[in-house]
Amino acid sequence: MSISAAQVKELRDLTGAGMMDCKAALNETNGNMEEAVDWLRKKGISKADKKAGRTAAEGLIGVDAGVREAAVVEVNSETDFVARNAAFQEIVANVAKVALAYGTTEAVAAAKYPGSDKSVTDTIKDAVGTIGENLGFRRSAKLTVPHGAVATYVHNAVADGLGKLGVLVAIETTGNEHAANAFGRQVAMHVAATNPMALTAEQIDPAAVEREKAIFSDQARQSGKPEAIIEKMVEGRMRKFYEEVVLLKQAFVLNPDITVEKALKDAEKEIGAPAKITAYLRFALGEGIEKEETDFAAEVAAAVKK
């Protein structure tokens, strides 16, 4: 199979590995990009798991909260300049308010925009003409608890409840809701910083777990040690993996000497009753969106030729 220069460049951008290593990885995996990333990781050449999540898109994350509930939305724009526009910010804030009532992306898109007979989708389409850029309502989600609090945090907020990264944390408790919300906000800040994969180990996608095990096994076998020792090595690395990606097992950012789970237990004294983190949501602007890269020099040359 012929491997193109574009494929090699894409793999290099994802992993930071050398061109020859990227070409070898693609040859070994018949051009399968995901398998090539794993091949490089197994060889110890790539730190792709840290780089593959890089994404790019503009717009804002919006957060709105009520009594024991909160919602988070993402509305995209073409440029960061528009994201700083007051009219655009008002749209995102209003969409977040709608999300607090309707929750899901589909329901919010079809719901009436505040103060209008038009839907959220149609209102955003109309705004394209006035703001002068392509805009899009991408997603929304909501968390609710019967008792307790849903805490919120917006990182580097450009306005109240608006920024590039928004987090919700649901804490169920019959204790003091103000104390639960205060601790929940600390956990939300932690989630913003660490981006855990799941709340508990059981909630991690089994395919992701098996993938990590396979990579750790291949890495351990390169040591040449007996199978029994390799098994112990893999167990140790999986334990560390869970400590890195499972929220409750992570070292608490505000006090790295304890886990989030232990911090929750300690917070129960202030809350005045048993408490449980039941869910969290983390919306980072542009996750999973590939932003088209443009060659400025080529654009200028093309414009001159017209």
Swiss-Prot record:
**GO cellular component annotations of the record:** cytoplasm
Q: Which PROSITE patterns does the entry mention?
A: EF_TS_2
Q: Where is this region: Involved in Mg(2+) ion dislocation from EF-Tu?
A: 79-82
**Database matches in InterPro entries:** EF-Ts_dimer_sf, Transl_elong_EFTs/EF1B, Transl_elong_EFTs/EF1B_dimer, Transl_elong_Ts_CS, UBA-like_sf
Q: Where is this gene product found? A: Cytoplasm
Main localisation, per the record?
Answer: cytoplasm
Q: Which domain of life is it from?
A: Bacteria
Keywords, in A-Z order: Cytoplasm, Elongation factor, Protein biosynthesis
Q: What one GO molecular function would you report for this record?
A: translation elongation factor activity
The record's comment on protein family reads:
Belongs to the EF-Ts family.
Q: What does this protein do?
A: Associates with the EF-Tu.GDP complex and induces the exchange of GDP to GTP. It remains bound to the aminoacyl-tRNA.EF-Tu.GTP complex up to the GTP hydrolysis stage on the ribosome.
Q: What is this protein called?
A: Elongation factor Ts
UniProt organism field: Mesorhizobium japonicum (strain LMG 29417 / CECT 9101 / MAFF 303099) (Mesorhizobium loti (strain MAFF 303099))
Gene name of the record = tsf
